């Protein structure tokens, strides 16, 4: 009689190798060389040696996981946050701020084939004036989770503190948690958003089921005791103000009101310096006509209008156009106009573009401005400032300007998000 045996499961032992890191990529990963290609290792810094296991091996690069760090770089820091390494918010708290800035500047310089002239930075801690915290009720423990997502996961890290938040928001975290835990409807909460505006703190609560009268009363009492403005979001496209006043923030001496859903730069200090540097680079003269593309609600547009003869702000989101017009009225600026346009279309054919522009500023989203560059070139401005949140699309769009006879005069790295992998920048182009 034949006897059959099941094949033994093959056990693969991953080889441990020892490598020395010689670089840090902009995402905070150590970079070593192995078998003639780049090896990316989270957790190791330049000058550090470690025993690592390769977890992914591609043709052009590989990834590895640290098993043991054999020495410490002089630029290694003790992370301030107890959640670092688990929370997906920060990737570089283990590296000195100087090292973070050097690695990001080097990556930007390589992409742009141009030296970074300056790093525009502010305080590296307590800088974030906006935070969205996920909420999740756990029936077994009857507890409410409140925090940020884990790195590479939808799981929530229960956050008790966050040292990159502005101090007012970090101090508020335990009290917000206690308030929300006490509500009867906390099984139906999606997230809570906190924003530190110029006139105080605002809070937005996303809930997926109606709040009863008791919960609404508790929330109102909480908002009054904390002195914050409270908004409820029963649906993703509905915002109900419950207490407080409309928020605003300062931009180069002007007051800009905004809705809790509007985009604002989360780093107030760097935003102020960025706007000031843009005005300086463009060298605005009293007779200049200036165009601001992807203008939002006027973060750059309105400060430009304090110096130029006239400014046109163009934006693809109608609500932001209305907010820009409102902010111009509130600040008494009569030489600025806002228009809602599809920025992929030829804006040079619009009535407001007939007289041309001396200077142009653009601040697009991560996708960049590929469809807009040819129209900018047709307008033939003397100077262009491009503010970017994605160096890859910035490099692509810059090629169009360089091929049209513009030159890069200044390149700056904006340290808008210290301790993270986000790299922002701004470039000054000048027509030859």
Curated annotation (Swiss-Prot):
One Pfam family this sequence matches: tRNA_U5-meth_tr
Binding site for [4Fe-4S] cluster: 81, 87, 90, 162
Domain TRAM: start-end pairs: 10-68
Role this protein plays: Catalyzes the formation of 5-methyl-uridine at position 1939 (m5U1939) in 23S rRNA.
GO MF annotation, one: 4 iron, 4 sulfur cluster binding
Reaction catalysed by this enzyme: uridine(1939) in 23S rRNA + S-adenosyl-L-methionine = 5-methyluridine(1939) in 23S rRNA + S-adenosyl-L-homocysteine + H(+)
Swiss-Prot/TrEMBL keywords: 4Fe-4S, Iron, Iron-sulfur, Metal-binding, Methyltransferase, rRNA processing, S-adenosyl-L-methionine, Transferase
Listed EC numbers: 2.1.1.190
Name of the protein: 23S rRNA (uracil(1939)-C(5))-methyltransferase RlmD
Single biological process term from Gene Ontology: rRNA base methylation
Binding-site residues, S-adenosyl-L-methionine: 265, 294, 299, 315, 342, 363
NCBIfam families with a match to the protein in the record: PRK13168.1, rumA
PROSITE patterns documented for this protein: SAM_MT_RNA_M5U, TRAM, TRMA_1, TRMA_2
Highest taxon in the source lineage: Bacteria
Record's keyword annotation contains Hydrolase: no
List of catalytic residues: 389 (nucleophile)
Family label: Belongs to the class I-like SAM-binding methyltransferase superfamily. RNA M5U methyltransferase family. RlmD subfamily.
PANTHER family: 23S RRNA (URACIL(1939)-C(5))-METHYLTRANSFERASE RLMD, RNA M5U METHYLTRANSFERASE
């Amino acid at each position: 009689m034949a006897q059959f045996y099941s094949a033994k499961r093959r056990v693969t032992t991953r080889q441990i190798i020892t490598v020395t890191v010689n670089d840090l990529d902009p995402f905070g990963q150590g970079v070593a060389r192995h078998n003639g290609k780049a090896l990316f290792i989270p957790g190791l810094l330049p000058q550090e040696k470690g025993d690592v296991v390769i977890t992914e091996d591609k043709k052009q690069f590989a990834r590895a996981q640290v098993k043991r760090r054999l020495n410490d770089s002089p630029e290694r820091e003790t992370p301030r946050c107890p959640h670092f390494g688990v929370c997906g918010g920060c990737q570089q708290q283990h590296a000195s701020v100087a090292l973070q800035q050097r690695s990001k500047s080097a990556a930007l310089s390589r992409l742009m084939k141009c030296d970074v002239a300056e790093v525009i930075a502010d305080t590296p801690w307590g800088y974030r004036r906006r935070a969205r915290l996920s909420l999740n009720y756990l029936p077994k423990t009857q507890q409410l989770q409140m925090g940020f997502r884990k790195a590479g996961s939808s799981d929530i890290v229960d956050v008790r503190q966050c040292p990159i938040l502005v101090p007012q928001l970090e101090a508020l975290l335990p009290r917000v948690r206690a308030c929300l835990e006490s509500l009867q409807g906390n099984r139906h909460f999606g997230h809570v958003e906190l924003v530190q505006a110029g006139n105080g703190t605002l809070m937005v609560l996303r809930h997926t089921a109606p709040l009863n009268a008791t919960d609404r009363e508790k929330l109102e009492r909480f908002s009054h005791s904390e002195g914050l403005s409270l908004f409820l979001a029963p649906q993703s496209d509905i915002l109900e103000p419950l207490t407080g006043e409309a928020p605003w923030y300062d931009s180069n001496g002007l007051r800009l009101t905004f809705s809790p859903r509007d985009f604002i730069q989360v780093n107030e200090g760097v935003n102020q310096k960025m706007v000031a540097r843009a005005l300086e680079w463009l060298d605005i003269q009293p007779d200049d006509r200036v165009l601001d593309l992807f203008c939002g609600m006027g973060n750059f547009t309105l400060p430009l209008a304090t110096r130029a003869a006239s400014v046109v702000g163009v934006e693809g989101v109608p609500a932001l156009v209305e907010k820009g017009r409102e902010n111009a009225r509130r600040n008494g600026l009569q030489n600025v106009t806002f228009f809602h346009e599809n920025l992929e279309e030829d804006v040079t054919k619009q009535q407001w573009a007939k007289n041309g522009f001396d200077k142009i500023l653009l601040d697009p989203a991560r996708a960049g401005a590929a469809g807009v560059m040819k129209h900018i070139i047709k307008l033939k401005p003397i100077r262009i400032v491009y503010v970017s949140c994605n160096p890859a699309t910035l490099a692509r769009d810059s090629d169009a300007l360089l091929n049209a006879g513009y030159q890069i005069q200044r390149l700056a790295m904006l340290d808008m998000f210290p301790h993270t992998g986000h790299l922002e920048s701004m470039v000054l182009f000048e027509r030859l």
